[in-house]
From Swiss-Prot:
It comes from Homo sapiens. Belongs to the cation transport ATPase (P-type) (TC 3.A.3) family. Type IIB subfamily. This is Plasma membrane calcium-transporting ATPase 2. The modification Phosphothreonine is found at residues 1139, 1188. It catalyses: Ca(2+)(in) + ATP + H2O = Ca(2+)(out) + ADP + phosphate + H(+). Pfam families: ATP_Ca_trans_C (PF12424), Cation_ATPase (PF13246), Cation_ATPase_C (PF00689), Cation_ATPase_N (PF00690), E1-E2_ATPase (PF00122), Hydrolase (PF00702). Up-regulated by calmodulin which increases the affinity of the pump for Ca(2+) ions. GO terms for cellular component: apical plasma membrane; basolateral plasma membrane; cytoplasm; dendritic spine membrane; extracellular exosome; GABA-ergic synapse; glutamatergic synapse; intracellular membrane-bounded organelle. The active site is at 499 (4-aspartylphosphate intermediate). Its main location: membrane. Mainly expressed in brain cortex. Found in low levels in skeletal muscle, heart muscle, stomach, liver, kidney and lung. Isoforms containing segment B are found in brain cortex and at low levels in other tissues. Isoforms containing segments X and W are found at low levels in all tissues. Isoforms containing segment A and segment Z are found at low levels in skeletal muscle and heart muscle.
Length: 1243
């Protein structure tokens, strides 16, 4: 059989690649078709064709133990024959395609048409042209030369349209290039572990070749197809390819097929790589998706698939999963593997593509548009907060612009016809028709000009520039942004749910305490004090029952700490062995990994790991280690001082917990219990019956492992809290350990009112009798929850979802989450921003995340917040500037056209203004670097309008100044400067000095206003930090230089006439007035301008003092801020005291006995400090109609201050009691949705 297949296959091989005749014993096609089989089918095929997996290894000239020799020629040959492990990216759009796309802009198309008509008419000389009888409504005749110049305006409009298009296309092109760079960086970071020449090495995924022996472990995303050759308890989530959500158990004799793009959910093992790149299962799907190319894009569904499918431009195994995900979504059963998205959300998400106008140009290497991709992975976010607000604003402005331009055209046409045919009683002569048409075209161009200026085309540009700039800079701050909008969403974050290990701590585990042989050692015990039997068991238990890939290596530099490789907890235990002056290597070489009989790997359900070995006498021994409270429950014996097992009763266990484990945990140590159990050789136990096997253990020792808090974390958390962001810690550790670490980090402060819950208790509280999660139950818990311990990934997801869906606070919460494990995927996807760990994170977590923290450090998250807020501010600055220009230009063009029948600002000039104002200003204002002061204000949240009242004040204030001066110049300018008036000039008259001065002054005012626009919170010093931004200075000076050229040499095309020096001085002087005027505006207190409140505001339920605080605190400097805050606190206090006096009798009721007396000043301060605890005490502003209600309400409010008598140490049980007693009693008074809900936890 073997011979036949061999010869048969050689003939095929000759056909396929004659040059590589007998290189390897199987062809690419054979392996590819083998990988398409599943389960038993595949096992049968392997047996029939090859014999077994080892035979395939021999044919591929590789060793299951040693791997490939790893020589360059061999690897090269394999790449040539079997292909490289990378999928070619979709071709980037060419510059011409981008130009074509930029031309699709509607306003530009209208302008092009107008310009072409204008050009055509200027070359057409109708017979009645010289006819005196035709319209002379404009007064004054043209001389010959001028008539010739009619074409200039049309040509100039076309030219400026081309400029705008080229600039847009160039921006898109550079952004795409940058994005590809980012993508390739993500790829290079993607590494995988293989065995070459007997050494375990990590290589980039692209370097993997057929025949490699790869080591797979929990959390990996398989980068290629392969056959399982050895391992333990390996379970794979194949839903990305098959749509089946059950995990598939892999074994050599039942199902050895490992497929690229699938996730390792449990266990570890080795695989022989059999297909890479386009020949792997994921690669085949990609090729199918990419094949249809452009036609598919048109069809919505397929376009979506393709967008995601081609996300993998190269070897990036991680990106593959997204593709595979979407492929699964679209190809298999249309069901996303993350079933947590409810219908309403997915609707919101589907609209994303339509609304995400800013992201349009971003055709990234990640395939399709960014928004295409978002549509595809439905489980990704809804439209980002900023995009939503911008889209809304752009639509509103666009509508206003359309209306204005239509009115302008109608008025001009009516004015002309009435003036010509009614007032002057001119007859309509056929030969005059072309002349009239020319007038109408001119009016139409004026109308379009108004529209062009009204629509802020610069908005999407400003957003993309700002985001792209931030993303680039964030790389330096260790934030690798995968989804552009995550960067801006981060600025709005109100809550961060962070992992403990590795993010808040250094993830360098060391054993510092131990309990061995009935003695609790507060430091590493002296080896001689431990019984030799116990010592031997301990060394074996640690060395064998931990992943063999975990090692402690000598330090790289002299005097540095030893390097920890692999699982950090296991490294801590191995370090303990070394500290006991023992060595674990001999034990491992005696009992190599292949000889391990059975392994129960660690997972979030078991919370322990066990390994079974066969002893020389054929009996079995199982070593176990895991979280002490879990493993101790399974122990029935414990080793005493003499190394003999003694009975370990529940009573002893409780005592041990009290005396050993709790003190360790309160020092912030993780406690790990190491145990063992012996089994007889016959009858052999049923290894699949885990409950019986993992029981009746004998405890060897309990160790306390320290994972020190990163030194920079407490400061970072303080910054977050100051910035109004609540930090919560979600960890799998014991509650005492978690609380101790939370206090060290500054997440909780002793004496505060907060909750620390265990996963079980959390679940008990949020579920009703039927076991369903209720949002209002979550709402009672999350505002105070600071630590969630012993939590499963599901708890994390539930918490994140609960906070995001909560309508309990004024502003809907924006939540960021950090995660590193495979099972953090759902929480990372659900969060508004998901952070994955770059070093410790699994591929699966990185895939689900929006931002990768390349240094796993919490303080990098604070940097992300800073950048996010900066993006928001940059866009607000640009908006403030842009809208001022728009308001002024539209009003000038509109009134000018209506009064003088001609716009003082010509179409070409408007386009120039539009170009500099839009493109350059967006560049200048969008690249302001962030400052620490950004972290001194509260998050904007979801409902805050883009244009605050201060900005509105600035926009209108500057518009008034500019309009006043422009109209002054328009109507009395000729007298001021003693020049000819430019009003009512005939059709093709030469440019006048008068209108040139108006244009020049207009541009000068914009230039100086650009400096004003740098500050949007009412700061006085607009020059602050201006030299830190060279781009800004360059653009302002550059624009000024170009303006000089346009005015002095622009001539006809720009309708400019050269100006004298004194005229220039006046223009600049009026422009400088902007800066002075800016100071005047800053002096007007925003709080007085109540009428501005409506602008751009979405919802507003706050009461007045609070709103003052929110609005003004951001907009006045800090000294004033403290003063203002003091006043408001006083008002607040007085208000509250009034209410309390009114209802003082209510406090005597038994319900509230024993609780604290009315709040002290500090508790009022506490209310202020935590935005999410703010209570809407709007009662004082409401006429007292329903007394009873108010009394109860006020009474509750009275007690809402943290009662310090209770809950000092804040154990979960304590607060549990408070909660239950209260809820039962206050149930009567709280109707769902009332603010009282927020208080129940604190009573």
């Amino acid at each position: 059989m073997g011979d036949m297949t061999n010869s048969d296959f050689y003939s095929k091989n000759q056909r396929n690649e004659s040059s590589h005749g007998g290189e390897f014993g199987c062809t690419m096609e054979e392996l590819r078709s083998l990988m398409e089989l599943r389960g038993t089918e595949a096992v049968v095929k392997i047996k029939e064709t090859y014999g077994d997996t080892e035979a395939i290894c021999r044919r591929l000239k590789t060793s299951p133990v040693e791997g490939l020799p790893g020589t360059a020629p061999d690897l090269e040959k394999r790449k040539q024959i079997f292909g490289q492990n990378f999928i070619p990216p979709k071709k980037p759009k060419t510059f011409l395609q981008l130009v074509w796309e930029a031309l699709q802009d509607v306003t530009l198309i209208i302008l092009e048409i107008a310009a072409i008509i204008s050009l055509g008419l200027s070359f057409y000389h109708p017979p009645g042209e010289g006819n005196e009888g035709c319209a002379t409504a404009q007064g004054g005749a043209e001389d010959e030369g001028e008539a010739e110049a009619g074409w200039i305006e049309g040509a100039a409009i076309l030219l400026s349209v081309i400029c705008v298009v080229l600039v847009t296309a160039f921006n898109d092109w550079s952004k795409e290039k940058q994005f590809r760079g980012l993508q390739s960086r993500i790829e290079q970071e993607q590494k995988f572990t293989v065995v070459r020449a007997g050494q375990v090495v990590q290589i980039p995924v692209a370097e993997i070749v057929v025949g490699d022996i790869a080591q797979v472990k929990y959390g990996d995303l398989l980068p290629a197809d392969g056959l399982f050759i050895q391992g333990n308890d390996l379970k794979i989530d194949e839903s990305s390819l098959t749509g089946e959500s059950d995990q598939v158990r892999k074994s050599v004799d039942k199902d050895p097929m490992l497929l690229s793009g699938t996730h390792v959910m449990e266990g570890s093992g080795r695989m022989l790589v059999t297909a890479v790149g386009v020949n792997s299962q994921t690669g085949i799907i990609f090729t199918l998706l990419g094949a249809g190319g452009e036609e598919e894009e048109k069809k919505d569904k397929k376009g979506v698939k393709k967008g995601d499918g081609l996300q993998l431009p190269a070897a990036d195994g991680a990106a593959a999963s997204n593709a595979a995900d979407s492929a699964n979504a679209s190809l298999v059963n249309g069901k996303m593997q993350d079933g947590n998205v409810d219908a309403s959300q997915s609707k919101a998400k589907q609209q994303d593509g339509a609304a995400a106008m800013e992201m349009q140009p971003l055709k990234s290497a990640e395939g399709g548009d960014a928004d295409d991709r978002k549509k595809a992975s439905m489980h990704k976010k809804e439209k980002s907060v900023l995009q939503g607000k911008l889209t809304k604003l752009a639509v509103q402005i666009g509508k206003a612009g359309l209306v204005m331009s239509a009115i302008t055209v109608i008025i001009l046409v009516l004015y002309f016809t009435v003036d010509t045919f009614v007032v002057n009683k001119k007859p309509w002569l056929p030969e005059c028709t072309p002349v009239y048409v020319q007038y109408f075209v001119k009016f139409f161009i004026i109308g379009v000009t108004v529209l062009v200026v009204a629509v802020p085309e610069g908005l999407p540009l400003a957003v993309t520039i700002s985001l792209a700039y931030s993303v680039k800079k964030m790389m330096k701050d260790n934030n690798l942004v995968r989804h552009l909008d995550a960067c801006e969403t981060m600025g709005n974050a109100t809550a961060i749910c962070s992992d403990k290990t590795g993010t808040l701590t250094t993830n360098r585990m060391t054993v510092v305490q131990a309990y061995v042989g009935d003695v609790h050692y507060k430091e590493i015990p002296d080896p001689s004090s431990i019984n030799t039997k116990t010592m031997e068991l301990l060394i074996n238990a640690i060395a064998i029952n931990s992943a063999y890939t975990t090692k402690i290596l000598p330090p790289e530099k002299e005097g540095a700490l030893p390097r920890q490789v692999g699982n950090k907890t296991e490294c801590g235990l191995l370090g303990f062995v070394l500290d006991l002056k023992q060595d674990y290597e001999p034990v491992r070489s005696q009992m190599p990994e292949e000889k391990l009989y059975k392994v129960y790997t660690f997972n979030s359900v078991r919370k322990s790991m066990s390994t079974v070995i066969k002893l020389p006498d054929e009996s079995f021994r199982m070593y176990s280690k895991g979280a002490s409270e879990i493993v101790l429950k399974k122990c029935c014996k414990i080793l005493n001082g003499a190394g003999e097992p003694r009975v370990f009763r529940p009573r002893d266990r409780d005592e041990m917990v009290k005396k050993v484990i709790e003190p360790m945990a309160c020092d912030g140590l993780r406690t790990i219990c190491v145990a063992y159990r012996d089994f007889p050789s016959s009858p052999e136990p049923d290894w699949d019956n885990e409950n019986d096997i993992l029981n009746e253990l004998t405890c060897i020792c309990v160790v306390g492992i320290e994972d020190p808090v990163r030194p920079e974390v407490p400061e970072a958390i303080r910054k977050c809290q100051r910035a109004g962001i609540t930090v919560r810690m979600v960890t799998g550790d014991n509650i005492n350990t978690a609380r101790a670490i939370a206090i060290k980090c500054g997440i909780i402060h002793p004496g505060e009112d907060f909750l620390c819950l265990e996963g079980k208790e959390f679940n008990r509280r949020i579920r009703n009798e039927k076991g369903e999660i209720e949002q209002e139950r979550i709402d009672k818990i999350w505002p105070k929850l600071r630590v969630l311990a012993r939590s499963s990934p599901t708890d994390k997801h539930t918490l994140v979802k609960g906070i995001i869906d909560s309508t309990h606070t004024e502003q809907r919460q924006v939540v960021a989450v950090t995660g590193d494990g495979t099972n953090d995927g759902p929480a990372l996807k659900k969060a508004d921003v998901g952070f994955a760990m770059g070093i410790a994170g699994t591929d699966v977590a990185k895939e689900a995340s929006d931002i990768i923290l390349t240094d796993d450090n919490f303080s990098s998250i604070v940097k992300a917040v800073m950048w996010g807020r900066n993006v928001y501010d940059s866009i607000s600055k640009f908006l403030q500037f842009q809208l001022t220009v728009n308001v002024v230009a539209v009003i000038v063009a509109f009134t000018g056209a209506c009064i003088t029948q001609d716009s003082p600002l010509k179409a070409v000039q408007m386009l120039w203004v539009n170009l500099i104002m839009d493109t350059f200003a967006s560049l200048a204002l969008a690249t302001e670097p962030p400052t620490e002061t950004l972290l001194l204000r509260k998050p904007y949240g979801r409902n805050k309008p883009l244009i605050s009242r201060t900005m509105m004040k600035n926009i209108l204030g500057h518009a008034v100044y500019q309009l006043a001066l422009i109209f002054t110049l328009l109507f009395v300018g000729e007298k001021m400067f003693q020049i000819d008036s430019g009003r009512n000039a005939p059709l093709h008259s030469p440019p006048s000095e008068h209108y040139t001065i108006i244009f020049n002054t207009f541009v000068m005012m914009q230039l100086f206003n650009e400096i004003n626009a740098r500050k949007i919170h009412g700061e006085r010093n607009v020059f602050d930090g201006i030299f830190r931004n060279p781009i800004f200075c360059t653009i302002v000076l550059g624009t000024f230089a170009i303006q000089i050229v346009i005015v002095q040499f622009g001539g006809k095309p720009f309708s400019c006439s050269p100006l004298q020096l004194d005229q220039w001085m006046w223009c600049i002087f009026i422009g400088l007035g902007e800066l002075v005027w800016g100071q005047v505006i800053a002096t007007i207190p925003t709080s007085r301008l109540k009428f501005l409140k409506e602008a751009g505001r979405l919802t507003q339920k706050e009461e007045i003092p609070e709103e003052e605080l929110n609005e003004d605190v951001e907009e006045i400097d800090h000294a004033e801020r403290e003063l203002r805050r003091g006043q408001i606190l006083w008002f607040r206090g007085l208000n509250r005291i009034q209410t309390q006096i009114r209802v003082v009798k209510a406090f005597r009721s038994s319900l509230y006995e024993g609780l604290e007396k009315p709040e002290s000043r500090t508790s009022i301060h506490n209310f202020m400090a935590h935005p999410e605890f703010r209570i809407e005490d709007s009662q004082p502003h409401i006429p007292l109609i329903d007394d009873t209600d108010l009394e109860e309400d006020a009474a509750l409010k009275q007690n809402s201050s943290p009662p310090s008598s209770l809950n000092k140490n804040n154990s979960a049980i304590d607060s549990g009691i408070n909660l239950t007693t209260d809820t039962s009693k206050s149930a009567t008074s709280s109707s769902p949705g009332s603010p009282i809900h927020s208080l129940e936890t604190s009573l």
